[in-house]
């Protein structure tokens, strides 16, 4: 593959992060273009929307945790389905934009965006009723979210009645 030097310099600049393992991965999710591509994937987005809307009874008056919330689209779906409150956890810089998106949708009192890595955060509630996450990616597990989802499940999900969406792949 041939690339010109200017493009190469820009690419290197865009991908230069400190030496921590997760920085390249999460840094790439700070750019809006990757979220735009996911939102444009109507099959994926509508599948999540329908899954939440078709299970409104499961979401009504429940505390929901959205891991890797990105733009907040799943959090918005959950809030509109009747969730009592949604905690949207996002490590990448897109978290700042998602707060604005949530505010523009009039859901800032129903959705709280928490910027940080799931494993490093302490939720303001002892447990949640539902965990939602787009943890499936390219080649099923490429997005590396499964570890964070399992951590949250073990630490925060109501052991008796808690649910996860999706719960299988």
What are these regions (language model features)?
Residues 1-67, 71-169:
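Class I SAM-binding transferase module
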């Amino acid at each position: 593959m041939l690339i010109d030097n200017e493009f190469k310099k820009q690419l290197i600049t865009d991908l230069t992060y400190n030496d921590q393992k997760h920085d390249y991965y999460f840094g790439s999710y700070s750019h809006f273009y990757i979220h735009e591509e996911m939102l444009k994937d109507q099959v994926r987005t509508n599948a999540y929307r329908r899954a939440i809307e078709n299970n409104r009874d499961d979401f009504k008056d429940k505390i929901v945790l959205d891991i890797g919330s990105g733009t907040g689209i799943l959090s918005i779906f959950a809030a509109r389905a009747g969730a009592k409150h949604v905690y949207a956890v996002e490590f990448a810089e897109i978290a700042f934009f998602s707060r604005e998106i949530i505010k523009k949708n009039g859901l800032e009192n129903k959705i709280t965006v928490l910027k940080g890595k799931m494993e490093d955060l302490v939720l303001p509630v002892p447990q949640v009723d539902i965990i939602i996450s787009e943890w499936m990616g390219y080649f099923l597990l490429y997005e590396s979210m499964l570890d964070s989802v399992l951590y949250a499940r073990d630490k925060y999900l109501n052991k008796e009645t808690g649910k996860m969406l999706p719960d299988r792949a």
